[in-house]
């Protein structure tokens, strides 16, 4: 019996955060035995916001090395760089012709980013969700892990796929209609200084973010200064409505140690101050990240191995993507290349 196909991508823009790890990359490693996994470093998506070429080049290699360091196995999964598989851009253009302007103008992420990057509101940023649809539909993905900021894009991908199937192949659909992948444990990683906002690797205030490659001393310092509350006496309790800062730190501690919230609450019952708890959270995060960082540096220095991973991943992805694109071109009426 074939495994369900999953596709997920990571952007090589900015340093990846512990939010990226706990919310996505750790799932990637855990899903490999039960799913047919397609994992992609989405550099084509990254340039919808202006990038420094040298920084993008290095960030792409960094992201690939991090994927490998957290446990993505190229023998179990297909790991590739998006721009190495031209079918993504080819299908993306074609799907533009089956997407309405009104659909894209309603995308909240476009509204948010166009406000943030007001001097560079480009067509690529507007059509970002269509390229994401192409990423998904090329591989016949059954499930797509998505955060709250991407759910709307997945809905659009479903609409585009349904529309195309209804026009050209209602009896024998070309595109699989993807479903969201809902993890059994959902890591909620929020800003360290404002726990009402999601931790973002692109946050201008670096006190809000812990990166995967962050120096241990910096991690400890940021956790020590993280938001808590002024409740007297102090109370360690998981309560997002009333204790968002503490709940955020508890989530990080739970993710790093495997302890349940109930166990954490019991451990710190009757604390006189939040300092010892913060100290333990910082040390637990350092311990969680140390082996990942060591493996990352080992892999990053082995460019020959990385090149081989990229080459094999692109070959595997292209073979599958080309089959889908050929079917699409045929039903649309394109003349095949002799």
From Swiss-Prot:
It is found in: Cytoplasm. It comes from the Bacteria. It catalyses: tRNA(Trp) + L-tryptophan + ATP = L-tryptophyl-tRNA(Trp) + AMP + diphosphate + H(+). Pfam families: tRNA-synt_1b (PF00579). L-tryptophan binds at residue 135. The keyword Zinc does not apply. Its EC number is 6.1.1.2. ATP binds at residues 11-13, 19-20, 147-149, 189, 198-202. The keyword Protein biosynthesis applies. CDD domains: TrpRS_core. A motif ('KMSKS' region) lies at residues 198-202. A motif ('HIGH' region) lies at residues 12-20. One of its GO terms (biological process) is tryptophanyl-tRNA aminoacylation. One of its GO terms (molecular function) is tryptophan-tRNA ligase activity. NCBIfam families: trpS. Belongs to the class-I aminoacyl-tRNA synthetase family. Homodimer. PANTHER family: TRYPTOPHAN--TRNA LIGASE, MITOCHONDRIAL. This is Tryptophan--tRNA ligase. It comes from Vibrio vulnificus (strain YJ016).
């Amino acid at each position: 019996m074939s495994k369900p196909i999953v596709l997920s991508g990571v952007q090589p823009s900015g340093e990846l955060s512990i939010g990226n790890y706990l919310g996505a990359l750790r799932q990637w490693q855990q899903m490999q035995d039960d799913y047919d996994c397609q994992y992609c470093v989405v550099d084509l998506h990254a340039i919808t916001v202006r990038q420094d070429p040298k920084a993008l080049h290095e960030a792409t290699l960094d992201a690939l090395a991090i994927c490998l360091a957290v446990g993505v196995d190229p023998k179990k999964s297909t790991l590739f760089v998006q721009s190495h598989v031209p079918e993504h851009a080819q299908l993306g253009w074609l799907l533009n012709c089956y997407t309405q302007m009104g659909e894209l103008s309603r995308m909240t992420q476009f509204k948010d980013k166009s406000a943030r990057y007001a001097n560079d509101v480009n067509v690529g940023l507007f059509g970002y969700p269509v390229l994401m649809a192409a990423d998904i539909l090329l591989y016949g993905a059954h499930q797509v892990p998505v955060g709250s900021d991407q759910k709307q894009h997945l809905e659009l991908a479903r609409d585009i796929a349904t529309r195309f199937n209804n026009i050209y192949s209602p009896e024998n659909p070309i595109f699989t209609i993807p479903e969201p992948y809902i993890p059994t444990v959902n890591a909620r990683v929020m800003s360290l200084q404002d726990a009402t906002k999601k931790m973002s690797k692109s946050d201008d205030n670096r006190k809000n973010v812990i990166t995967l490659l962050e120096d241990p001393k910096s991690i400890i310092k940021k956790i020590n200064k993280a938001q808590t509350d002024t409740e007297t006496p102090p109370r360690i309790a998981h309560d997002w409505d009333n204790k968002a800062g503490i709940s955020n730190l508890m989530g990080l501690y739970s993710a790093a140690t495997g302890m349940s919230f109930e166990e954490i609450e019991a451990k710190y019952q009757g604390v006189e101050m939040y300092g010892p708890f913060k100290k333990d959270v910082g040390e637990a995060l350092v311990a969680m990240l140390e082996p990942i960082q060591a493996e990352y540096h080992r892999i990053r220095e082995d460019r020959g191995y990385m090149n081989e991973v990229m080459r094999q991943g692109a070959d595997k992805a292209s073979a599958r993507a080309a089959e889908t694109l050929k079917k699409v071109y045929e039903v649309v009426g394109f003349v095949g290349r002799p």
